[in-house]
């Protein structure tokens, strides 16, 4: 799983199901693909979204700011700063500074995530705030590790509140990952279209998959409901590749 796919998975796992989730998924996909480069408009859109908690907006704002190239002097947004202040608790700020010092020594996404997971959500948010306010700098990869650790903690608490049995991999994250991977597989199918006779058939399969993912995000589904989705998609893609004599290795 690529780094950006992992980030997309974790961030979407904390967004409540509904039409807005499908919209945010599309925005993230566009941002990570370099298709959306207007950070100012993106932040204005995010600020006015209903339903999302201030912290979720703050995390999304942080991710957009990390990913979208922007002018050096672009002003930081108050709604993100307020969300990432650790509820104004000085203890959170103290812990955030300690965490930041540890993160400065990390160079990998997974290393940063591992270190961050031992801190509270408030301390993690405060640490993001430090970086967002340019009071500290880490590599983008390390910052994404911090983001995913925060999302995992939030998803864990949401999962516990659903009174479902906690397994080693959080079902909300696993469910979201299936949908993100299914969506990416559909995109890969579309990119391979060309002008062959089978192109229309494959575009149809990809389109159906996209619609299914969007519907699942919009109406909300149980985490186990996406289990067969990715496998069905991969099967369709591999069957198509086999007919076309294309190497299948890349999409396994």
Swiss-Prot record:
The keyword Cell wall biogenesis/degradation does not apply. It is a peripheral membrane protein. Its main location: virion. It is found in: Virion membrane; Host nucleus. A motif (Nuclear localization signal) lies at residues 101-105. Residues 165-252 are annotated as: RNP-binding. Pfam families: Flu_M1, Flu_M1_C. This is Matrix protein 1. The gene is M.
């Amino acid at each position: 799983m690529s780094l950006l796919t992992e980030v997309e998975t974790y961030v979407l796992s904390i967004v409540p199901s509904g039409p807005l989730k499908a919209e945010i998924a599309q925005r993230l996909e566009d941002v990570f693909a370099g298709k959306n480069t207007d950070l100012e408009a993106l932040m204005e859109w995010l600020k006015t979204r209903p339903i999302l908690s201030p912290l979720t907006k703050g995390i999304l704002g942080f991710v957009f700011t990390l990913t979208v190239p922007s002018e050096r002097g672009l002003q930081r947004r108050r709604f993100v700063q307020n969300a990432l202040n650790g509820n104004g608790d000085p203890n959170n700020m103290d812990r955030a500074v300690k965490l930041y010092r540890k993160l400065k020594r990390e160079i990998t996404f997974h290393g940063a995530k591992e270190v961050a997971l031992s801190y509270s959500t408030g301390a993690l948010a405060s640490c993001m705030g430090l970086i967002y306010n340019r009071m500290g700098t880490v590599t983008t990869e390390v910052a994404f590790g911090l983001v995913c650790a925060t999302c995992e903690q939030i998803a864990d608490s949401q999962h516990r509140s659903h009174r479902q049995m906690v397994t080693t991999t959080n079902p909300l994250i696993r469910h979201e990952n299936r949908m993100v991977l299914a969506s990416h597989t559909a995109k890969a199918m579309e990119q391979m279209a060309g002008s062959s006779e089978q192109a229309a058939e494959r575009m149809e399969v990809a389109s159906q998959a996209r619609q299914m993912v969007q519907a699942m995000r919009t109406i909300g589904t149980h985490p186990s409901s996406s289990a067969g989705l990715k496998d069905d998609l991969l099967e369709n893609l591999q069957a198509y590749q086999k007919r076309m004599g294309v190497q299948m290795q890349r999409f396994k």
